[in-house]
Amino acid sequence: MPLASRLFLRHARALALAVLAACVWASWGGSRLEVDDQPTSIIRSDDAAFAQMEEVFEQFGSDDGTCLLLLEGSDPFTPAGAAGLRRVTDALTGLEGLVAGVTSLLDLRDPLGRPLVPEPEAGPERFAAARERARLHPLAADKLLGSDGTTNLVLAQLADETLPVAELRTRVRAIEAALEEPSSTQPWTVSLTGVPPLRVQIFDAIRREQVVLSLLAGLVGAAISFAVFRRLAPVLITSAASLVSAWWALGVMGAAGETINLLNAALPVLVLVIALTDGMHLMIAILRRREEGADPHRAGAHAIRSLGRACMLTSLTTAIGFASLAVSDIEVIRRFGLVFAGAVGLTFLAVVTVVPLLGSAFLKRAPSGSPALHGAGLARPFELLARAVVVRSRMVTAVGTLLTLGMAALSLQMVPDNRLTEAVPHDHGAARSLERMEAVFGGSVETSILVEYEDEQRGLDAMVAVHEALEREPFASGALSIVDVLRSLPGQGTPQAAALGLLPEALTRSLVRRDLRRALVRFRVPDEGAAVAEPGYARIQEALEGVEGEHPGVALHLTGTGFVARRNVNLIIEDFALGLWVAALTIVLVLAVAFRSLRLGLLSVVPNAFPLAVAGSVLTALDLELQVSSVLAFTVCLGIAVDDTIHLVSRYREERDRGRAPEEAAVRAVTAVGRALVITTLVLVGGWAMLLLSEVPTTQLFGLIGLVGLT
């Protein structure tokens, strides 16, 4: 890039002022950034299922705003158990403005209209009779009372169901504080679980670790860089360029009105990795030129002239490749692709300006030379390796291609998977409580069946059939609908539509909307992976189709957060994984055009695809799920592979333009670029390894795949 090099030589001060102005502007943009921690933002789509779920929430209320209190070792049908249950519910109802409603066994009535749970002063016979009635009560068994008889649930519905995590945290903490007194005075345990506390624990764990792990990764990477460069200035300069890249990217996101969500929150890490790679190449070129006697300013200009084109191609091809994600049907992926493409372009500008500018200011002392970096100690092994490969080029190409194809085929066996607790540390209270709840109640993830009917009685008859189908299905448990409410009334056998008029609308609004001729059948499913969940939902869907056929005028639809979120997150993973392969192929085409050689473009397929194939095959071999964190790690692998490939091919073309034979050009390219590749890889691997120390399973998976792809 001769023009950019001359611009740097003649107008370095103006360039520095422009960089400072861009940083100020990025600070303004970054100050406008907001975090979108709404649970439905990442699963939002334009399809009918999501629109139907939102409509159901508007009509019946959300299904993910309920805290579940698991009371274990407490028989509510004893004087002590009944008194303890009442203390728990009283503590929750006292949280006015935070908790909208509390549901427990205390709200149920027996056929005579008496409380199902007697007062603590009642005699043993009364409690024994109540225990037997509860076992058969349609609103108690497997819904509020566990199969063991000593575990029961209390449901605390939060006021204002759709809340950001900050507000959720306040309410969860208030519930925990309110439960301290009734929990401490009882021999049984009270634990809090459900979607709100799980969400709070996930965000808190990730936020806490972001600071600690980022600091550790930075320190390890800096230590490795210092060991290689043997000087502090090159380490600080390359680190500063990477940080400025992330800074600018966040600034543009804020200025454009983009919000931080669970997907694009990883963008700063991806930008840092790409910036560090290019920054290392530039720094090594500058130091090498300084050892040859050039002053810092001219050394920086030479680095821009010799490597600027390769850095630009790296950014251009990566940006075009990820911009191809804009064709996705899922909004969050479309936006991620466009934002990432823009961020990569800014990364190029930051690296090719910040590294030379800081080098001019802080590399004035003549380098003493690092044998590991500049001498023959590291160059000789690369030369020997390159010559060995060149001699056996056909065999190496064939073996590499076959390995890539084989591992890619193995990677295709991966299936997308997601669970409610996949990002929750296994030893955290809410996750452990959820596991115990599933063992006793059969499930924890709420799903719903929307029942649309023309005639009320036909609708009730269809709901009875749905209940019978769910009772036969091992994947479902705890089905609840207006049918159960009607069955709990005195003298009710087969639910009759006429009895609906006896029920207060305020108590049944979450189950039936007579004005809309709609009702819900709510049930729970276990928080299992795709191997269990997908067949389970398929069997339920098949059963619903059978019920529809037997009840004309009735339509049944699976809905709810548990069902729609699983499906849409899986679609995100599938679309993202496919988009990465499309991006890889797009990058190949761009390279072919940039180097004016279809052959070089095709030759870059294997080195670009190899890290993805290796990481995918390792994931398959370890029987690990393909999650959102997995595809983000694949993004890192692709970005690094493209960067390394372009720098190597660019140097090869440069050697060929000097008249060297293909074999000699390849050897010299590997010898010259290989050192930078090794140094960059060592720094990234050292920092990335710190992610394995995380207590968050998805972060550990992200770190594992990144390490495999980088090495």
Q: Predicted regions span which residues?
A:
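Feature of extramembrane
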Residues: 1-228, 232-233, 374-577, 581
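Membrane-embedded transmembrane helical bundles of large multi-pass transporters/channels
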Residues: 1-37, 41, 55, 160-166, ...
